[in-house]
């Protein structure tokens, strides 16, 4: 029996060593062992909120995920915590708002991202239930393949001396190299990353229809916010003209949004007690899309996002 235990102990040594490395290098700071993390993943941000529940939160997809929180605070005079993450659907954002309301009874304010893209009924990702299970169960995190791959990537970058977090959504575009299609030689009027973006989102937008069930759920959550004294602001972030002219107008989305959806949203805002800030259709910022947009949905984090940050958060004072 003693020999068996010794053999088992020896077998467990490499496993224990691996998980020690995992704890040291996992980039999401799940266990709170690191002072800071630059991870923008959903698990990282939700776990940080569990450890320190802020009174003002930002909920949305990637267009609201890259704010400089110091600049947010300067413009609004308030302290914010971001829970926004890439690819978040309207359902996931509703789930997240419900979760925040449950987690923090002292919540004061929430910014909620919405757009024609997340309103699309076919864009209905559903990951919040899995996230909640992972938040509650450390072993689910430890044995999750994706998070282990993330750790190994972070470890590899550390060993190579590569700065974690990547280069960000920004570019100093050079003509003609960054304006030319490498396959056809065609020269675009805007930089290539922006020029090809409409084609990337076009397939998902072809059968566009409003997700009325999730929109009604948002209104119910707005009622809960109003009853609890939580200020809710629904924000439609700006998009580039290329998306408007090459996707929204040809597919009839623009007409539906401006003629039906937005008037209904304004009525709902009055009825359910939330504020509505529309930078996607009504108050489109006069940005130079070639320099201030990284792609069709995302403002350049150096040349466009800071300007919109000041506009948005000044409106939230």
Label every PLM stretch briefly.
Residues 100, 292-317:
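Histidine-centered active-site loop/cap adjacent to the catalytic His
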Residues 94, 211-219, 254-265, 306-309:
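Well-ordered, non-membrane alpha-helical segments in soluble/globular domains
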Residues 242-279:
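Substrate-gating cap/lid alpha-helix
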Residues 114, 123-231, 237:
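Secreted/periplasmic serine-hydrolase-like ester/acetyl group-modifying domain
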Residues 41-68:
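Short extracytoplasmic
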Residues 6-27:
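Hydrophobic membrane-insertion alpha-helices, especially the h-region
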